């Protein structure tokens, strides 16, 4: 197949306000290492998903995957910040994001919704010790990647709070809830993270499906950073599904076990 891609961006910035809009068209832009190979290990080039990349568990439960056969869409971001004069330890940050993608036209000339996400978040630094954040995301996606018109919808709510004891010690907590009438129904999640800068970090988390399977997906991790190297050890129960990092997605089966991650920069 002959492939092509169009990408357009426009941005605006004035004082505390900024905005960015991106539009993209893709058609057969993936390059495979072998003709008969399958999976992400057989893909030579990188096609990022131009959507908001979440770090929260439930907001990233069903991430968008680029439709390499053909998609059209884009996203828009708007930022606004309120920072009182002379008070660096107090501020408000407001952010709104919208992204949507449709499949290429089929044989009857009709395209279908692949992904839509309408989200917004507010971050508030109360003083030198306390920072809070609240996020709302309304996501709709195609479970068949545009093969049929059926879509699933999720409404996600996240509360995030960080407390700093001093310059090196802080604790952060998350409370999350996902409401849905589709697929696995409702989810809830919580996380506690302790940071002892600049070396140690500890965290425990749990996702619970209270709408269908009634299963817990717990995880605990310890990480140590030295110079430009970071090593992390974790143990937990992981659900089957796609794991995405930087827009690259791979399918992972359900498992319970431990893992070691080593990251270094040169």
Predicted regions and their residues:
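Exposed, low-structure sequence patches enriched in small/polar residues
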Residues: 1-266
């Amino acid at each position: 197949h002959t492939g092509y891609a169009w990408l357009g961006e426009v941005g605006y910035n004035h004082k505390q306000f900024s905005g960015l809009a991106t539009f993209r068209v893709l058609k057969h832009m993936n390059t495979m290492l072998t003709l008969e190979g399958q999976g992400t290990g057989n893909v030579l080039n990188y096609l990022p998903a131009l959507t908001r990349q979440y770090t929260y568990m439930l907001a990233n439960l069903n991430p968008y995957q680029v439709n390499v056969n053909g998609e059209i869409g884009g996203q828009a971001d708007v930022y606004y910040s309120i920072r009182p004069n002379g008070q660096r330890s107090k501020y408000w940050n407001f952010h709104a994001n919208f992204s949507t993608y449709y499949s290429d036209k089929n044989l009857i000339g009709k395209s279908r919704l692949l992904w839509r996400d309408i989200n917004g978040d507010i971050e508030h630094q109360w003083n030198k010790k306390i920072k809070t954040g609240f996020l709302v995301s309304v996501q709709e996606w195609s479970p068949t990647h545009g093969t049929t018109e059926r879509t699933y919808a999720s409404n996600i709510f996240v509360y995030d709070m960080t407390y700093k004891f001093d310059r090196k010690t802080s604790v952060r907590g998350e409370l999350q809830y996902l409401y849905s009438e589709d697929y696995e129904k409702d989810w809830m999640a919580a996380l506690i993270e302790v940071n002892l800068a600049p070396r140690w970090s500890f965290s425990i988390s749990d996702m619970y499906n209270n709408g269908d399977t009634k299963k817990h997906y717990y995880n605990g991790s310890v990480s140590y950073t030295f110079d430009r190297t970071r090593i992390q050890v974790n143990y937990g129960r992981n659900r089957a599904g796609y794991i995405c990092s930087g827009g690259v997605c791979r399918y992972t089966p359900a498992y319970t076990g431990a893992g070691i991650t080593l990251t270094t920069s040169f």
